[in-house]
Amino acid sequence: MLFARNAELLVTMDEERREISGGGFVVRDGWIDAVGPSEMFAVEPGAAVLELGGHIVIPGLVNTHHHLYQTLTRAVPAAQNANLFGWLKTLYPIWARMGPDAIYTSALVGMAELLLSGCTTISDHLYMFPNGARLDDEVRAAQEIGVRFHASRGSMSLGESQGGLPPDRVVEREPAILRDCVRVIEQFHDPKPGSMLRVVVAPCSPFSVSAGLMRESVDLARSHGVQLHTHLAETLDEELFCQQQFGRRPVAYAEELGWSGPDVWFAHMVHVNAHEIPLLAQTGCGLAHCPSSNMRLASGIAPIMDYRRAGVKVGLGVDGSASNDGNHMLLEARQAMLLARLKLAEDERQAHASGAEFAGAVQMTAREALELATLGGAAVLGRKDIGAIAPGMCADFVAYKLDRLAFAGARSDPLAALLFCAPQQPDVVVVNGRVLVQDGQLTMVDLPPLIERHNRISREMING
């Protein structure tokens, strides 16, 4: 049993969105048992006590889209100023040099960085398996470091010789892809409430595999009760390619392939029209909004407030560590808030320029941004047991000291300070009732030798 108490502000994100001054809660066997003002609770004999005076406490953040292996190729000079397709063409040959240790080590580095940003649930999309690499390498890292993990078994089957972008040596044969999807589901997927590990079927995109594999992936995932994930509508180049190749827009093409329903979520969804947003809401699809990556690659601004008004499930993703190039979920929530405000201003400018009436939509608030990073991500991942500090929820929570320089002058609204002020690292991170960050330090990983090994692998890959 763990008793967390005396938080300066406990942000529950429960159904009533309670924010409790002097709040506390009880954790039993990895679950939140009770929540309220700290004076409500008596400390039971033998219980561990976590004193959180002077801290703001929030639910653990949820990352709905990532490529952890890309921590190995951050800020590569030739890829720094490229758009998506040029960026991929530059990095694919480097990624082709990865092996099992590269996948494992990069996953540990990315997960460590995410934990130190307040992220407790990570969904990663691994779609390259060169030189004997397997999804198992990431799973091993997640189990060692202690994060809650959704492992997306990605795939690419169309190499350069078939009109695709990746080198032929990194694509797989489609029967082998399907067999391995079944293997990892049967070996790793845990559908139970409180699960620490789930598996997702996730072709890289509808343009990097055949239409047949997209359809077979739907059948396989639904027969095994797992979710489906892919990239969609990220760039204008993609939209043009889809219309030229298939005679329809990306969303319509995905729906034609069976990629529609509450078990489906897409990464990005930047370039959609007014007719497609209600369709996504009606079918229950979710999306991972990746603001930093979309800005980094000049892909565009996703209409997040339009999605929210329509009732589409929206979570946040830091996306590839080589298209971000960081792993900071609190920063991603801040970026989402600021980019939504920029989109609002641009929509207003365009309306005035065309003489159209502007509805005067409101700006995204700090509390809405935090909701995207918690409950929004939980909904996208099909989870009802994470995203809030409430009885019956998983004991995943994060605490930040408020007496630091970055929050000076911002104590009147500590929650807003988290989003408006410079993003900070947490002092405490707990996942499944287990302390993984204490006093700002990781408890399960020795960082210096890990970083040294990671940098050595990175140099070897980049230098060839």
Where are these regions (language model features)?
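C-terminal cap of metal-dependent C-N hydrolases
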Residues: 13, 394-451
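Metal-coordinating catalytic core of metallo-dependent amide/deamination hydrolases
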Residues: 133-271, 275
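His/Asp/Glu-enriched, well-ordered alpha-helical/loop segment
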Residues: 256-263, 305-404, 420
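Active-site gating loops and adjacent loop-to-helix segments of metal-dependent hydrolytic enzymes
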Residues: 72-103, 158-174, 236-263, 283-286, ...
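N-terminal metal-binding scaffold of metallo-dependent hydrolase/deaminase domains
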Residues: 1-44, 55-56
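Divalent metal-coordination and catalytic microenvironments
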Residues: 7, 25, 30, 54, ...
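Alpha-helical scaffold segments that flank or form the walls of functional sites
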Residues: 26, 74-125, 129-148, 178-194, ...
